[in-house]
Structure formats: C-alpha cells, structure tokens
C-alpha cells in the first residue's frame, strides 16, 4: 500500500507545471486531490486530461490564492467532498523579474501576495483541519531563488526566501503544539513550467535557457 493511498490533498497551481505533476503522482498512488487554480478554462479540461483516473478521485476549485475568503471556501469544499485534509501543496506562484529600482510597488506587492501570502493563508486554514485528521504534510514550493539572489529578481527572491523561513516557523509551531504535521519547503532550480514563459517570450527559448543556465 502506498503511503498516500486514501489520503486527501489540496494542491494550488494545479492546472500546470509542478502542481499538475504532483497531482498526477499523488492520484497514481491512490490519493484524492482537490485541484486549485485561478485558470478556470484549464481546470475545465481536467476530466479529459485525467481520464485515466477515477473521476471521483479529484475535484476542482477556481481559486485566487491571495483571497482569504476563497481559502476558507476551498478548505470547506475539500472537507465536505472528501471528508478530511491530509496534504497541502502550495505550488501557485508568479515570477515578475525586475531590479530593485525598476520594480513598481504594485508589482512587488502582487508577487508577495501570490508567492508568500498565499502560503500563509493555506497553512493557517489547513493546519486545524489536518490536526483533526491525526496527521498531515505541508509542502511549500519555494525556489533556488529563495536561497541564491539575482540582481534583477528582487521581489521574487524575497518572496521565495520568505516561504523558506515561514515553512520552518510552521514546522516549529506544529511541533510545539504536538501535532503530527510536517511542513517543508522545496527549492527547485529552473524547471520548464509556465512560470518561465515571460522569460522565454522576452529572449526566445534558446537564449532564455542560456541565460538561466
């Protein structure tokens, strides 16, 4: 039996990239998944894209991860449909690159709202439900850019570094409370996902790969 068989997961940014890959993997091992994403059109294609799985094994939720009320609704929908919450993968994110002088304050706030505030909200509202389920695992997708800075990624660097330390704080909180809930951040290097599309569009795919390397 898989470690995740019968478990229930919420995945943000699940319509594409790492979020979608995680959803497929968890479902292949018997988990039930709530697929959250802001892109309704792509979510609507999930029954076809996931046709090899039992259609009762997943559900979708159109979700602005920066909206607190939407998080409350997502948590309630997941518990109502699947009965519990065991896993949260905070995968939603954006990358709007610019140096510290060129970055507009509205852009700075937007990047932090999507990349960092959403992780705070997800953890805040998932932990009480996970503690009721007996155990849980939270995986927050940070980035190598949360460890190694770039001169032209000020907002992205700081938002992803924030995810790293927030995850540590959440893990310590759960340990202090005696909850059997793990919280970890992961820090991928460059992965060919839609978050890199602006870079590829700006420089062309080959030059973008060369710059990122």
Label each residue range with its predicted role:
Residues 3-34:
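Canonical Rossmann dinucleotide-binding motif of NAD(H)/NADP(H)-dependent dehydrogenases/reductases
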Residues 99-100, 107-112, 138, 212:
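Substrate-binding pocket helix/loop in short-chain dehydrogenase/reductase
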Residues 101, 148-155:
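Active-site loop immediately N-terminal to the catalytic Tyr-X3-Lys motif
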């Amino acid at each position: 039996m898989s470690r995740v068989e019968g478990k229930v997961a919420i995945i943000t940014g699940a319509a594409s990239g790492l979020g979608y890959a995680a959803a497929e993997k968890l479902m292949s091992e018997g988990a039930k998944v709530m697929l959250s994403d802001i892109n309704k059109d792509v979510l609507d294609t999930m029954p076809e894209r996931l046709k090899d799985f039992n259609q009762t094994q997943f559900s979708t939720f159109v979700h602005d991860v920066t909206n607190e009320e939407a998080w409350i609704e997502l948590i309630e929908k997941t518990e109502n449909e699947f009965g519990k919450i065991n896993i949260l993968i905070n995968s939603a994110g954006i990358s709007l690159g610019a140096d510290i002088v060129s970055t507009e304050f509205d852009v700075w706030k937007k990047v932090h709202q999507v990349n960092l505030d959403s992780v705070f909200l997800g953890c805040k509202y998932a932990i009480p439900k996970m503690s009721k389920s007996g155990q849980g695992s939270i995986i927050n997708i940070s980035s190598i850019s949360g460890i190694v800075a770039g001169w032209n990624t000020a907002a992205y660097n700081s938002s992803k570094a924030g995810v790293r330390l927030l995850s540590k704080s959440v893990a310590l909180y759960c340990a202090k409370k005696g909850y059997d809930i793990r919280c970890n951040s992961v820090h991928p290097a460059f992965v060919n996902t839609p978050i890199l599309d602006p870079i590829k569009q700006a420089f062309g795919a080959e030059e973008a790969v060369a710059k990122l390397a």
